[in-house]
């Protein structure tokens, strides 16, 4: 078999669970049409649970339609961009689907963004409307961006009566320094009320024709790992396809009978599509958390008999040692998934020893509408992030972007499927650079260095931009970090290459020690530890201790920030 056929023959298909299709049936629907169908099908089922407050699918549809009618009355129309600057709460779900109901584009903004970052996204996305948490309004005001309308909402609006004060105080603690605008300020600025739009308008939004294939649904912004964040263009078809792909790959659930923990932030594509949209598509109840309080999440898993739990590496690394983790019967859950970054093998092993349950890893990015690969439930492989989900094609290309790599060799992962973005918003050059042609079709270049083994499982090595060239050798930053994490006194680590005229790049390790080890372990001891476990050319030449490391929105160590800092930028 030639190299090209080794990938195009899809060797991973033999590992699909029985009954899983090579490609799923994708409904010819827009996202709001899907939500309306689900609401009619599961009318009396619980859709959202918010700190004890329950909202049925029927009631959720009514709220979505009322809010859509209210937005339309304020001038929001098809083609507009509506920004959501919200924490996880029922208002997020309502506003998200209401904007889509009108044919508008949604651009979710991270609640932890500074006013400068908010300004960039508002201007770049051409948003005219912002749905905003009241405690975040100051950041919108500071941007100075001219907006047609700002709708304010409070986290307490959908809290049970006994939780209202607690909710406000918890948020004040989490978002210290932020304050709610006074009634006078609201009136002076002409701000709209979320609840007023709900109560004043009937559930009769205007009829809008949406082309699922052509019309944009969401403009999610990438993390800005190279320059300013940019938006991936995701159509209604992309969104509908992804939920169909994911649900067909994990045929574990009973429609209308599942409960999913929804603490991953909805502004991020992982929480937005895998948790929120796919959860609702299954008729599940979503248990929402505004802030990721571990004790509350663990209690809710048992209280509501949760069946699905989606997390990120930092969460599992914390839970594997947390004293209250054993309060949950993890073996009862049907699905435990880790995404957004690779999980250290030591964490996987410690988790399995402690809980008796298995974490399934997956892979994806904003540009793939969250997911392209996942681990089959019956046959996960350690060290692998899984196999392509139904409808996906994957291959490994050489560094020059011309030829496919032989099976087992490392190169750049390229992808093709119905969930792949249409391109980057207002960046035609970036779009052209993001795709390569294979077999007469466009394939997405992920920028990730990956290999595929003989069985069709894929293995992650590093981001292409994080590959360090030292004395002519290629060094994967992640490989060095994996060794550092094996040290019992290292809590966190980030490795980058620092440009050097003589050797290409010097390898630098930023290290956070466990509190009891600080001041007792030297930089040279860390270097010596690495010498015992790494080839000579992979050993860091510089070690710098830190109290903490910069993180991305999903808790990854931000190598970009470390790299910029080390280069004096």
Question: Where are these predicted regions, by residue range?
Answer:
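Conserved adenylate-forming
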Residues: 74-76, 200-214, 219-262, 284
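Flexible, low-complexity linker/hinge segments
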Residues: 20-29, 169-216
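Conserved AMP-binding/adenylation subdomain of ANL enzymes
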Residues: 240-259, 267-308, 321-322
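Structural core segment of the AMP-binding/adenylate-forming
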Residues: 73-74, 101-196
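AMP-binding/adenylate-forming catalytic core of the ANL superfamily
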Residues: 113, 130-134, 309, 417, ...
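Gly/Ser/Thr-rich phosphate-binding loop
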Residues: 306-311, 320-381, 393, 402
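Conserved ATP/PPi-binding loop(s) of AMP-dependent carboxylate-activating enzymes
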Residues: 387-391, 402-435, 473-475
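Conserved AMP-binding/adenylate-forming core of the ANL superfamily
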Residues: 25-27, 36, 44-89, 93-97, ...
């Amino acid at each position: 078999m030639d190299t090209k056929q080794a990938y195009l023959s899809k060797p991973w298909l033999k590992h699909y669970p029985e009954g899983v299709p090579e490609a799923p049936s994708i409904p010819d629907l827009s996202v709001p049409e899907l939500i309306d169908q689900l609401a009619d099908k599961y009318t009396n089922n619980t859709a959202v649970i918010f700190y004890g407050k329950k909202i049925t699918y029927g009631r959720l549809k009514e709220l979505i339609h009322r809010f859509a009618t209210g937005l339309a009355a304020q001038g929001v129309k098809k083609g507009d961009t509506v920004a959501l600057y919200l924490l996880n709460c029922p208002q997020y779900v309502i506003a998200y689907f209401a904007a889509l109901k009108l044919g508008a584009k949604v651009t979710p903004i991270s609640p932890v963004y500074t006013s400068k970052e908010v300004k960039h996204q508002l201007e770049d996305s051409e948003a005219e409307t912002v749905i905003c948490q009241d405690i975040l309004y100051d950041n919108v005001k500071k941007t100075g961006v001219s907006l047609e309308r700002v709708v304010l909402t409070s986290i307490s609006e959908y809290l049970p009566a006994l939780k209202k004060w607690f909710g406000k105080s918890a948020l004040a603690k989490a978002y210290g320094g932020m304050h709610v605008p006074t009634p006078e300020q609201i009136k002076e600025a002409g701000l709209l009320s979320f609840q007023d739009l709900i109560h004043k308008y009937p559930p009769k939004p205007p009829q809008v024709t949406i082309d699922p294939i052509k019309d944009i649904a969401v403009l999610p912004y990438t993390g800005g790992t190279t320059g300013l964040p940019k938006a991936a263009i995701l159509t209604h078809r992309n969104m509908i396809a992804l939920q169909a792909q994911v649900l067909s790959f994990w045929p574990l659930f009973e429609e209308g009978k599942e409960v999913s923990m929804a603490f991953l932030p909805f502004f991020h594509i992982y929480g937005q599509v895998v948790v929120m949209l796919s959860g609702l598509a299954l008729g599940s109840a979503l248990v929402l958390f505004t802030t990721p309080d571990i004790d509350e999440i663990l209690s809710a898993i048992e209280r509501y008999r949760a069946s699905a739990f989606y997390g990120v590496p930092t969460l599992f690394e914390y839970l594997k040692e947390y004293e209250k983790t054993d309060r949950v019967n993890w073996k009862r859950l049907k699905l435990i998934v880790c995404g957004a970054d690779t999980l250290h093998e030591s964490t996987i092993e410690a988790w399995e020893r402690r809980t008796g349950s298995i974490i399934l890893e997956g892979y994806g990015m904003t540009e793939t509408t969250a997911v392209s690969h996942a681990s089959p439930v019956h046959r996960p492989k350690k060290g692998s992030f899984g196999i392509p989900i139904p409808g996906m094609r994957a291959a490994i290309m050489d560094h020059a972007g011309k030829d496919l790599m032989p099976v087992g060799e490392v190169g750049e992962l390229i992808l093709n499927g119905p969930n792949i973005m249409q391109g980057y918003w207002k960046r035609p050059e970036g779009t052209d650079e993001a795709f390569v042609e294979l077999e007469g079709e466009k394939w997405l270049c992920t920028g990730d260095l990956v290999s595929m083994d003989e069985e069709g499982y894929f293995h992650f090595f590093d981001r292409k931009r994080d590959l360090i060239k030292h004395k002519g050798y290629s060094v994967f930053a992640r490989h060095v970090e994996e060794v550092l994490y094996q040290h019992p006194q290292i809590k966190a680590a980030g490795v980058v290459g620092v440009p050097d005229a003589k050797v290409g790049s010097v390898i630098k390790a930023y290290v956070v020690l466990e509190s009891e080890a600080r001041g007792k372990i030297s930089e040279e001891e860390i270097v010596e530890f690495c010498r015992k476990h790494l080839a000579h050319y992979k050993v860091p030449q510089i070690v710098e201790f830190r109290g903490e490391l910069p993180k991305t929105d999903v808790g990854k160590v931000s190598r970009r920030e470390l790299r910029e800092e080390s280069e004096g930028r």
